[in-house]
């Protein structure tokens, strides 16, 4: 085995392990949310988190990954929507040339679990306050917002061009949430100002 193949395997293994660890955060946030609500809603919360992660995964596969990491401009990616298995197995090739040290599938897995966990952070504030369809709509919209923000920082966007580095994702995850909450607050408060 060549050293480059060994390095690729090690990088891929590490990214997949990290993605699995981030996925476990979903369970942690579900437990936190269940602990903050009445006991009769605990099963509803667990099921909701699984369903919304599914919605997030589908939206991120169909549109979000292309917006975040597809070739495009400094605001959003304009290619690579609904990636095929073959395109995700390539390393460092268009439209996902951002992933130069791991296959696109490993990068996709890592990014989709981050999009899902950023949604789970928000759900704690919405527990017992919304109907199930609201979670679906909010989850799809938030996944798109997360995709745009991740393109700005990680996908070669305008913040990346300014030299911004975000290794752990705190800027992308938190700023996506803040933009969404800001839009909601502005729409509710604007008639009163």
Placement of each model-derived feature along the sequence:
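Hydrophobic alpha-helical transmembrane bundles of multi-pass membrane proteins
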Residues: 1-183
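Positively charged, low-complexity/disordered segments
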Residues: 182-193
């Amino acid at each position: 085995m060549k050293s480059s193949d060994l390095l690729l395997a090690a990088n891929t293994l590490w990214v997949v392990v990290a993605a699995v660890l981030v996925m476990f955060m979903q369970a942690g946030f579900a437990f936190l949310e269940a602990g903050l609500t009445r006991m009769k809603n605990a099963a509803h919360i667990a099921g909701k988190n699984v369903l919304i992660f599914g919605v997030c995964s589908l939206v991120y596969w169909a549109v979000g990954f292309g917006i975040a990491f597809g070739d495009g401009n400094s605001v959003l990616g304009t290619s690579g929507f609904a990636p095929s298995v073959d395109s995700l197995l390539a390393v460092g090739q268009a439209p996902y040339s951002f992933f130069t040290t791991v296959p696109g599938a490993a990068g996709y897995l890592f990014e989709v679990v981050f999009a899902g966990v950023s949604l789970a952070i928000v759900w704690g504030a919405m527990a017992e306050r919304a109907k199930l369809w609201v979670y679906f709509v909010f989850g799809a919209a938030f996944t798109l917002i997360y995709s745009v923000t991740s393109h700005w920082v990680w996908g070669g966007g305008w913040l990346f061009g300014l030299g911004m580095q975000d290794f752990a994702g705190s800027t992308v995850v938190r700023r996506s949430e803040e933009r969404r909450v800001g839009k909601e607050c502005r729409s509710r408060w604007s008639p009163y100002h």
